[in-house]
């Protein structure tokens, strides 16, 4: 019995002779194991995976991206992520590639007064690029914190407006940097950090701590930049702060970018 031949349309030549910078898949969820200071944690990541496509090719082999994820069963760290990136480019027979892996990352925290323990989640992204045989890795964390307005505190007889804020730190490093370390930098420079669970005594503590440590978004990004400037492991960084204003229907925002290798 003869088997029916199935046409491989994407492998035929393309006559338009226009190269594509990125082609691949987006928003595919996959379980992963991430190395952390306590060992390994299990989470679910959302992947974006792309490679370049030469001008004479009609399409990429989309199924190969999914095959790669299902074949990869190692604990993901900076080193294994780079190997995954290089392997993707080789498997897709491309010259350049990009992988973005975004996932919730959990850290156990202890309430400041009661000592009650809870988990706190953070948004973390691994970003890998390879071009002309050279790879670049970026680590990004988004840290929710509390911010309290210095102006509001100064002009008010009682209290000051405060709100939840997001501090984002993206780095390129020459040595290993723990995710927890970046998160700690952001929390230390905020008006106050957040906790998954607080009792009344803890609520009093965090309220008073924020009141004693007011900061604009400009203060937050400058203070964090000062810490990153002193860290010799970090070659480049981007720091962002966004306050979801409690007295306005808009956000306050600030950003600092620095490439130490160019300065």
Curated annotation (Swiss-Prot):
Top-level taxon of origin: Bacteria
Classification lineage: Bacteria, Pseudomonadati, Pseudomonadota, Betaproteobacteria, Nitrosomonadales
Family: Belongs to the GTP cyclohydrolase IV family.
Record key words, sorted: Hydrolase
Record's keyword annotation contains Transferase: no
UniProt name for this protein: GTP cyclohydrolase FolE2
Gene Ontology molecular function terms on file: GTP cyclohydrolase I activity
GO terms of biological process kind: tetrahydrofolate biosynthetic process
Site (May be catalytically important): 149
HAMAP family membership: GTP_cyclohydrol_B (MF_01527_B)
Role summary: Converts GTP to 7,8-dihydroneopterin triphosphate.
Pfam families: GCHY-1
InterPro entries linked: GTP_cyclohydrolase_FolE2 (IPR022838), GTP_cyclohydrolase_FolE2/MptA (IPR003801)
Keyword Nucleus: no
Catalysis performed (reactions): GTP + H2O = 7,8-dihydroneopterin 3'-triphosphate + formate + H(+)
